[in-house]
Amino acid sequence: MSRQSRRELRLNTFQMAAPSHNWAGLWKHPRDNQVNYHQLAYWADMARTAERGLLDGIFIADVFGIYDVYGGSADAALTAGAQAPQMDPTLLISAMALVTQHIGFGVTASLSNDHPFSFARRFTTLDHLTNGRLGWNIVTGYLESGARGLGQQALRAHDERYDVAEDYMTALYKL
């Protein structure tokens, strides 16, 4: 293989600001330290470790609301600690950026939860504080509990959410 045709492999860690992400119940294991997800030191240590390991980035997934799709209730998610409770992942990034130089930060943020102006302000601030090391996973939300948490009667239909997202992105580009 010629040097020009070689492709780079990018390595990231996939996290969530919750007791567990895709490994529901692991928080019960005595050696699991994700139970410290609510402490800044946990995230700073993770960022330092990722940078020492030469990873390219830390991606923090997020979902607004508690999983209420299994049996129409949040009981199963809450019992297993499955992505609940969750913290706002954007608030963790500046602490991780402070203790690293090269790691990139990706974060999920829903267009359904913020006004475009406040969203642009928050993400522009993070982009500056990280020296341009911020990426955004754009989502529109999909949990009824998230919609109810925002005072809505129900989650908007899929196509309507994406129509709103298109308008939202148009507004963001102008800001």
Placement of each model-derived feature along the sequence:
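N-terminal beta1-alpha1-beta2 module of alpha/beta enzyme domains
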Residues: 1-99
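Flexible, glycine-rich active-site loops centered on histidine and acidic residues
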Residues: 6-9, 14-37, 111-175
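Active-site-proximal glycine-rich helix-loop-beta segment
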Residues: 54, 101, 130-132
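Hydrophobic residues within beta-strands of alpha/beta enzymes
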Residues: 58, 105, 134-136
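Short His-Asn-centered micro-motif
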Residues: 61, 108-109
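Glycine- and other small-residue-rich loops at beta-strand/loop junctions that grip anionic moieties
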Residues: 85, 108, 115
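Conserved catalytic cysteine-centered active-site region
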Residues: 98-107
